[in-house]
Amino acid sequence: MPQTLQLTNPMDMHLHLREGEMLSAILPFSANPFSAAVVMPNLKTPITTTAQALAYKRQILSLCSTSFEPLMSIFLTPDLDKQELIRAKEAGIHILKLYPKGSTTGSEKGVKEMLCEKTLHIFEIAQELGFILSIHGESNGFCMEREYEFLPIFAHIAQHFPRLRIIIEHMSDRRSLELIEQYPNLYATLTLHHITMNLDDVLGGGINPHHFCKPMLKTKKDQQALLQAALNAHPKVSFGSDSAPHLESAKLNSKGAAGIFSAPILLPALAEVFAFHNALDCLQTFISNRAIANYKLKHFPIKTITLERVENPVPPYINTPLGHIIPLRAQTNLSWRIKEENR
């Protein structure tokens, strides 16, 4: 087995960077090893306009000590109009993010009726202008079936808007894999946690709130199917971490926040998984090439990340001015670490 590994232009196609002091504290974990990342718009005040997105991008870049391209997205609301979409396109923003209302953190201003006339009209304009539609696809039903119950909506949009590129974000259900095979314009992202864990890691040995996320971790069969898609670098699947930091105090209460903070360990942990399954030769394609192709990326900083096979202890917490954040794999040892970042 190789003792070192080079990755070129890692891409994270689903990332939560938050704002204010939290943004300042966590940004380096993503900006340093990744060339670019799709930045989620679900802030306390959602990013619903081009002006807001550009201001947020400037804030992110002002805090970067390395070359990094934030790929901004617009929070889709029923009030989004063609002029705003044109402004976004002219500013280099190509991603719309659709949240079903109340489906996850910061989605209170999301869309209530997925297929109403207003929403379909926005899809039509988005198709015309060449946008990518990224969707947190969950119903309001039983928590383990929410993604599956949303699949007919994905199918409807894919059928009626065949030139609109649609992303099933943070795919968690093996039945979603079957759907992306049916429609040429339907793609997906996969997280580290959905390919390495299942519901047993949340509830099997006592409740672990640090593994609680949306969409929920599913069954062992789901995990295995998604893992194989990653290990094989499925042509329609890109890596998207959905790294979502919450303070420890927000996770450890009676209404614990949904989200897993994986940014500090992403590349070493992925190297560990792919090495264990003798698939290191597919990691470059999964972590970068698929995103560049599926999102038609043309402008991003060139980076080479060198990893080495050596014990890498994960700290018990990440300290911020606001309090502690518990990272994924806290207080365990990874078998790979980042040795060098050429940027």
Curated annotation (Swiss-Prot):
Pathway terms, separated by semicolons: Pyrimidine metabolism; UMP biosynthesis via de novo pathway; (S)-dihydroorotate from bicarbonate: step 3/3
Zinc recorded as keyword: yes
One GO biological process term: 'de novo' pyrimidine nucleobase biosynthetic process
Residue sites binding substrate per the record: H16, L17, R18, N42, H136, H246, A258
Residues modified to N6-carboxylysine: K97
Annotated positions binding Zn(2+) 1: H14, H16, K97, D242
Catalytic activity line of the entry: (S)-dihydroorotate + H2O = N-carbamoyl-L-aspartate + H(+)
This enzyme's EC code(s): 3.5.2.3
Cofactors (names): Zn(2+)
Cofactor: binding details: Binds 2 Zn(2+) ions per subunit.
Top-level taxon of the source organism: Bacteria
GO CC field: cytosol
UniProt binding sites for Zn(2+) 2: K97, H136, H170
Function (record text): Catalyzes the reversible cyclization of carbamoyl aspartate to dihydroorotate.
Official protein name in the record: Dihydroorotase
